[in-house]
A protein has these predicted regions:
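Conserved active-site "lid/cap" helical segment
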Residues: 1-84, 153-160, 182-188, 201, ...
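Condensing-enzyme catalytic core mediating Claisen C-C bond formation in acyl metabolism
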Residues: 1-23, 166, 197-258, 262, ...
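Conserved catalytic cysteine-centered active-site region
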Residues: 2, 52-104, 112-117, 121-145, ...
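Buried hydrophobic positions in well-ordered alpha/beta secondary-structure cores of metabolic enzymes
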Residues: 7, 33, 42-45, 86, ...
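Beta-strand segments within the central parallel beta-sheet cores of soluble alpha/beta enzyme folds
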Residues: 41-50, 75-81, 105-109, 163-169, ...
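Short glycine/threonine-rich loop-to-helix capping motif typified by GTGT followed
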Residues: 53-60, 241-244, 277-299, 327-329, ...
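Active-site-proximal alpha-helical scaffold in enzymes
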Residues: 80-111, 143-177, 217-222, 324-346
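Extended C-terminal subregions enriched in glycine
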Residues: 249, 253, 258-280, 289, ...
Length: 377
């Protein structure tokens, strides 16, 4: 099959864009990526998005990009997979290039959430649950799900709320050096642990925020310095009670295994990682599922500093969802944006000698997981 390479990336600042429309954010990131790629002829557009219809009364995002950027009469599509929408959109673009159908594809992701009130956004996000499930009818929310996960993890290990705070603090410190991150104010373990409780044991800093923003990637069969070595997508249980065990998010582990197999690599080969840390607990589970640390020992790696920029396995050098921000449809592509800069040696919190990178993007409570492995040639 045809190989796929990354030619350009673009990203807006994440945060509150009350003065901008969803469309303007989407076009901004797309223009950046096209300029970085040298304005190539685009054969198709895929846009990752979850909430534009419900929150902004706007669909037809792919057609908007093609029309407003003058890309001509080309195939376009919006891709939805809850919080994994961006990662899934990228995979669709990659498959189009690998199949030979397209030479060059623009993949973009966007979300605008800050203009709406929290209850309305929460209600819209809950569409990423199985609405006929017992869990939904019982009133379980996403913070509630990951709070239950954290409680059980504490019970099975020596981990405490302080270890969650260590994840949140590490990601906030990383975001301080990222000019595009939503949060750039220093904090402390004490402030994190004493913050307003969202759902026991998760406090405010343990939960990803509502965010406006966009990111975009240009991929092509034409060689460049960044090779997409593997792309994997897996669907998993749509409710917690369907998983074989509570302390597992099977889709993460399976998507990781498939990506490693396709790449001919293992966790030991990865130099820098962007994880879908929608909650601090999720980062710990994900680094275990992806094989970077042993099962039920991710908290020890966090405590030892192994996931910091200078550690054994640097995780979320961008600040992650917790501090870079989480504009749902753009999140998976913002991970790629950071990792491309890491591999090019131009990233905030640069990991010395980074050559192989992994991005993991989660949807729902584990309904989707997309993993991409990138290599600097």
């Amino acid at each position: 099959m045809t190989k796929t390479y990354i030619h350009g990336v673009g990203m807006t600042k994440f945060g509150n864009h009350s003065d901008r429309t969803l469309k303007s954010l989407l076009l901004d990131a797309s223009r950046q990526a096209l300029e970085a790629a040298g304005r190539p002829k685009i054969d198709a557009v895929f846009v990752g998005n979850f909430l534009a219809g419900s929150m902004s009364n706007q669909e037809i995002l792919g057609a908007i990009v093609a029309n407003d950027l003058g890309l001509g009469y080309i195939p376009t599509a919006k891709v939805e997979g809850a919080c994994a929408s961006g990662g899934i959109a990228l995979r669709q673009g990659i498959l189009g290039v690998m199949s030979g159908e397209y030479d060059t594809v623009l993949v973009a992701g966007v979300e605008k959430m800050k203009h709406a009130n929290t209850p309305d956004v929460t209600q819209a996000i809950n569409a990423a649950m199985d609405t006929d499930s017992n869990e939904k009818h019982a009133g379980l929310t996403f913070p509630g799900f990951f709070g239950v996960l954290a409680h059980r993890y504490f019970h099975e290990t020596g981990a405490t709320k302080e270890h969650l705070a260590m994840v949140a603090l590490k990601n906030r410190e990383n975001a301080l050096n990222n000019p595009l991150a939503q949060f750039q104010k220093a904090t402390s373990i004490e402030e994190i642990m004493n913050a307003r409780l969202i759902t026991e044991p998760l406090g405010l800093f343990d939960c990803s925020p509502m965010t406006d923003g966009a990111a975009a990637i240009v991929i092509s069969r034409k060689p460049s310095s960044i090779h997409v070595r593997a792309s994997a997508l897996v669907s998993g249980p749509t409710q917690m009670q369907d998983a074989a065990e509570l302390l597992s998010i099977p889709a993460i582990g399976e998507s990781g295994r498939r990506a490693y197999e396709k790449a001919g690599l293992g966790p030991e080969d990865i130099d820098v990682i962007e994880i879908h840390d929608c909650f601090s607990m999720t980062e710990i589970i994900a680094i275990e599922e992806l094989g970077f640390f042993k099962r039920l020992e991710g908290w020890k790696a966090v405590e030892a500093g192994h996931t910091k920029p200078g550690g054994k396995k640097p995780v979320n050098t961008s600040g992650g969802l917790l501090s870079r921000g989480h504009p749902i449809g753009a999140t998976g592509l913002s991970q790629i944006y950071q990792l491309v800069h890491q591999l090019n040696g131009t990233a905030p919190n640069q990991v010395k000698g980074a050559r192989i990178a992994l991005a993991q993007n989660l949807g729902g409570t584990g309904s989707y997981s997309a993993v991409h492995i990138l290599e600097r040639l």
